[in-house]
């Protein structure tokens, strides 16, 4: 699933489309997590004026309307031309006045293309926690959020009500780098540990964005370019390999239905 760096990279790669006018809208398959709106054709004639990211959502603002885009498990946008071959799971095509096409591709259909309105704002955006790269995500905030949570720290970090966009990859790497067991009860972390964790999450995410995110299977940005953060992974996806710090075999633990790779030597589980 694309995480915050991949969504941020996708948004950035779409910026050249700003101020271009939509000429036509083609829905090839409306079946996504929620159906593509039947009236999406009203985008025709409108310029794309703004692109922002909130959590793993892209907020696309046109002259009259706003849309909420989410990549789901396997979604991606691709900037193309009419000469480029269509793919089976290209669900939506926005064609701009200069002939450029913006195609939304989603084999597993867990993504969404919705109007940003009062209903979607209330349901999808309002419950979200702070952005991890914002000043609102700091040690004092995280300490208050975690002090009563008995779940493992990794589960807490992946809770969008606590902080948005810290998915499996970047939570795994942050905890590994700090020697914190992913199942360590969140409330047991000390204030110095929480400060270090906030700083490490910010560092990891910034670095991942600089490298274009992680291409583990088929992720590319809208220009078809791969990310390279996966080349720096020390724990995620490396279960059974040797720890780079102590040469102990890395182990895999299932937490919240997600695989969590850790080093039993460098990341011991500590009880109060």
Curated annotation (Swiss-Prot):
Name the gene for this chain. Answer: mutM
Gene Ontology biological process terms in this record: base-excision repair
Q: Which GO terms describe its molecular function?
A: 8-oxo-7,8-dihydroguanine DNA N-glycosylase activity; class I DNA-(apurinic or apyrimidinic site) endonuclease activity; damaged DNA binding; zinc ion binding
Keywords of this entry: DNA damage, DNA repair, DNA-binding, Glycosidase, Hydrolase, Lyase, Metal-binding, Multifunctional enzyme, Zinc, Zinc-finger
Q: EC number(s) of the enzyme?
A: 3.2.2.23, 4.2.99.18
Check the record and name the HAMAP family matching this protein.
Answer: Fapy_DNA_glycosyl
According to the record's subunit comment, the protein's assembly and interactions are: Monomer.
Q: Could you tell me what this protein does? A: Involved in base excision repair of DNA damaged by oxidation or by mutagenic agents. Acts as a DNA glycosylase that recognizes and removes damaged bases. Has a preference for oxidized purines, such as 7,8-dihydro-8-oxoguanine (8-oxoG). Has AP (apurinic/apyrimidinic) lyase activity and introduces nicks in the DNA strand. Cleaves the DNA backbone by beta-delta elimination to generate a single-strand break at the site of the removed base with both 3'- and 5'-phosphates.
Give the organism, scientific name.
Acinetobacter baylyi (strain ATCC 33305 / BD413 / ADP1)
| Family the entry assigns | Belongs to the FPG family.
- Per the record's keyword annotation, is DNA-binding included, yes or no? yes
Under the heading PROSITE patterns, the entry gives: FPG_CAT (PS51068), ZF_FPG_2 (PS51066)
The answer to whether the entry has keyword Membrane is no
Q: Which domain of life is it from?
A: Bacteria
Reactions mediated catalytically: Hydrolysis of DNA containing ring-opened 7-methylguanine residues, releasing 2,6-diamino-4-hydroxy-5-(N-methyl)formamidopyrimidine; 2'-deoxyribonucleotide-(2'-deoxyribose 5'-phosphate)-2'-deoxyribonucleotide-DNA = a 3'-end 2'-deoxyribonucleotide-(2,3-dehydro-2,3-deoxyribose 5'-phosphate)-DNA + a 5'-end 5'-phospho-2'-deoxyribonucleoside-DNA + H(+)
> What name appears for this protein in its UniProt entry?
Formamidopyrimidine-DNA glycosylase
Explain how, and how many, cofactor molecules are bound: Binds 1 zinc ion per subunit.
Q: Please name the catalytic residues of this protein.
A: 2-3, 56, 258
Q: Where are the zinc fingers (FPG-type)?
A: 234-268
Which residues are noted in the entry as DNA-binding? 89, 108, 149
Cofactor(s) needed by this chain: Zn(2+)
